[in-house]
A protein has these predicted regions:
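N-terminal Rossmann NAD(P)H-binding glycine-rich loop of SDR-like oxidoreductase domains
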Residues: 2-26
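Nucleotide donor/acceptor-binding cores
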Residues: 3, 29, 100
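NAD(P)H-binding glycine-rich loop region in Rossmannoid oxidoreductase-like domains
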Residues: 6, 33-97, 110-113
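Class I S-adenosyl-L-methionine
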Residues: 23, 42-45, 133
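Conserved SDR Rossmann-fold cofactor-binding beta-strand/turn motif
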Residues: 26, 35, 143-144
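A generic structural motif
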Residues: 26-31, 137
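Glycine-/Pro-rich loop/turn segments that contact NAD(P) or position catalytic residues
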Residues: 76-150
C-alpha cells in the first residue's frame, strides 16, 4: 500500500508549491491537505487530493485529519503570537494519530537575542524542533531562510 502524505498550509505560498511538486511525482490519491478554508482548496480537490478542514488551534480537527496518514509536511504557522502552542498541538496530534514521519519547515537563524525582531520566530522554531526530537517519531527538519521570492 502506498504511503499517504498530508501537507499543512497547502493554500499558502509554500504549501501550494510543495503540493504542486508532489502532484508531478505522485498520484493525487496519495496526497491530502489540511486547510482552514476549504473553499480555497477546490482546485486541489478537483484534482483528487483529499481536503481536510482543520486548524492548528483545534486539536480535534488535527486528530481527524491525521488519521490514516503516514507522513506530514508541516508548514510552520504564520500566527506568530500563537505559533508555539499551535506547533505543540500539531506534534502531539501527529503522535497520537500514529504519524510515521514529519517534515518540519524550520528556520536557519535561531541564535537571536531577546531584543532581536525575529526572536519570537526563532524561539518558536527551537521549541518545535525540541518537541520533534523528543516525540519518538521520525522527523526531518528543513532549515529555511526568510522567504523573499513569493
Amino acid at each position: 500500500m502506498k504511503e499517504k502524505i498530508l501537507i499543512t498550509g497547502a493554500t499558502g505560498n509554500l504549501g501550494k508549491l510543495v503540493l504542486n511538486n508532489l502532484l508531478e511525482e505522485l498520484p493525487a490519491s496519495q496526497l491530502s491537505i489540511l486547510v482552514r478554508d476549504v473553499t480555497k482548496a477546490t482546485e486541489f480537490k478537483d484534482k483528487g487530493v483529499t481536503v481536510y478542514n482543520g486548524d492548528y488551534n483545534n486539536y480535534d480537527s488535527l486528530i481527524s485529519a491525521f488519521k490514516n496518514i503516514d507522513n506530514i509536511y508541516f508548514v510552520s504557522s504564520s500566527d506568530i503570537s500563537n505559533r508555539t502552542k499551535q506547533h505543540e498541538n500539531v506534534i502531539n496530534a501527529a503522535k497520537e494519530a500514529g504519524i510515521k514521519h514529519i517534515v518540519y519547515t524550520s528556520f536557519i537563524r535561531k541564535n537571536e537575542t531577546e531584543t532581536s525582531p525575529i526572536a519570537a520566530v526563532a524561539n518558536a522554531h527551537l521549541k518545535t524542533e525540541s518537541w520533534l526530537k523528543n516525540s519518538g517519531m521520525d522527523y526531518t527538519i528543513l532549515k529555511h531562510t526568510i522567504y523573499a521570492d513569493f
